[in-house]
Amino acid sequence: MKNVIVLIFICYTFNFVAFADTGFFFYVQFADKNNTPFSLDNPSEYLSQRAIERRMFFGVAVDSTDLPVNPEYVSTVKNVGVKIVGKSRWLNGVTILAQDSNIMQNIRNLPFVTKTQYTGRRTTQQYVSKINKTINEDSLSYGNSETQIKQIKVNALHNLGYRAKGVQMAVIDGGFLNANTNPAFDSLRFHNRLLGAKDFTDSNPNVYANENHGANVLSIMTGNLPNKYLGIAPDASYWLLKSEYSTNEYLVETDFWVSAIEFADSAGVDMANSSLGYRTFDDPSMNFTYNDMNGQVSRASIAAEMAAQKGLIVCVSAGNDGTGSWHYIASPADAKGIVTVGSVMANGNPSSFSSYGPTADGRVKPELCAMGSSTAYVSTSGTPTIGNGTSYSSPVMAGALACFLQYAKENFTTFSVEQLLSAVFESGNTYLSPQPQTGYGIPDFQLAMSNLNNRLSDISKTSHKNHVFYNSENQTLYIDKDIIGNENITLYSVLGRVIFNKKLTTKQISLKQYNLPSNIYILRIGNTTQKVIVY
């Protein structure tokens, strides 16, 4: 990154032949989703089964924001003479590339368009040599990732067998140079835990070329070099999503980020990590101000909050402006409901470069800190090394949370993301006195396990579930009388459609009126879920 946020202190030297203007990016806002061919009754048309199951687990209903943008609107805009680069179902708009900015008046005149925004210029970048990289650390001081893992006591999870197995993570970043050949990712590829890679920048579809930032971040989570290096979440599965446009810095990158996080949601990932941030751009008229850092201005921040609302755990780097004139976190680190991660040194002191909170509206940011000074990672050549930046503390935290998520899923019938994160926040060494640079501080995941156990012990998998019985003859649910009047009850189809949502006031609920076909349904009572077989 250049003028946005350099989230890792590495010096890059790029040698380019030329830059050639090839168009203008715009964001186009639609008024509605009227007459869409998609339906809330059939979310499998636009969400993966895993995405639907995640919503059901956390009690999140499929709603209108999940519906894709109206394809007729998209087609009409395209036929004006522009290229559709990205679509946002959550924000109900599209990112376009126009060769002639004068054509935009025709788009503004369309009856379903409420506004357009210029977001940057597209250039073609030609490389004549590889990236020349120097790092402000001479050599690795400890040979593996032990220090950064033990600092937050994730080894306690590892020792119990929780290494993020079954957890899917999206890494939203720049390029992933050599991730398809790097020996540090041999086990990732061999065990088919590399789920796929996508470019959202409409530039180079080969995400394994040119840029190494994303690959470095990935190695912190899943790098594996026997006796040399072990990532913090080595058994998780990963999507590699490129949203960073390397040739320049424009507002359009926030829209690329939105496309990436929406894809991650629809693919059904459990978590996302992004070591990117946005505040200033090549065109100063696009710059954010600190007052914009309230979670409601940047489209990336709005989308990050929406991802959290849909059950994703989202980790974002705080930024490296602690000693700079900007000083504060940037977008999307200002989003509500996500985990913004600052940096500390091995001794626990804050890294001087780590950006400060709070948000412009006074919320604690960053929430947590992990080791971002002299953090161990694996280079694109497959050699363990170290570097600095909140780009590196964020994947440390994301990987730790992935292990913690596996622990929670294997020990409790149900829980919320809020309960999970609260257990971690409360384990922070400054939880009772949040600090502007470190938030709740350095978490202790051994303590977080205890916190979660205390919180959820009443719904442990060793405890009984709600007593529910389905009588197929009269199509009636019979429910334990002890919980009548105390909880809400929701019945979902396996596709995530809400069949009913009501206050539980009687121990008998007739399903006749719903004409349910024989299938498996998900019943949620309060904070617990269980399957109901209708036949």
Q: Language-model segments: which ranges?
A:
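Extracellular S/T/G-rich loop segment that most often corresponds to the catalytic His/Ser-adjacent loop
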Residues: D173, N192, A330-Q406, E410
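Primarily auto-inhibitory N-terminal propeptides
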Residues: F19-V85, N102-Q105, P111-Q125
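Subtilisin-like serine protease catalytic core
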Residues: D21-G23, L40, K115, N155-K198, ...
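Substrate-binding/access-modulating region of protease and related hydrolase catalytic domains
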Residues: H158, R163-A164, N224-N227, L240-D334, ...
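C-terminal subdomain of the subtilisin-like protease fold in secreted/lumenal serine endopeptidases
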Residues: E146, A267-N273, Q406-H467
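Hydrolase catalytic cores
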Residues: L218-M221, L241-Y245, Y328, G372-T438
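Autoinhibitory propeptides
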Residues: P71-I149, V154-H158, K336
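C-terminal outer-membrane/trafficking sorting elements
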Residues: S460-Y535
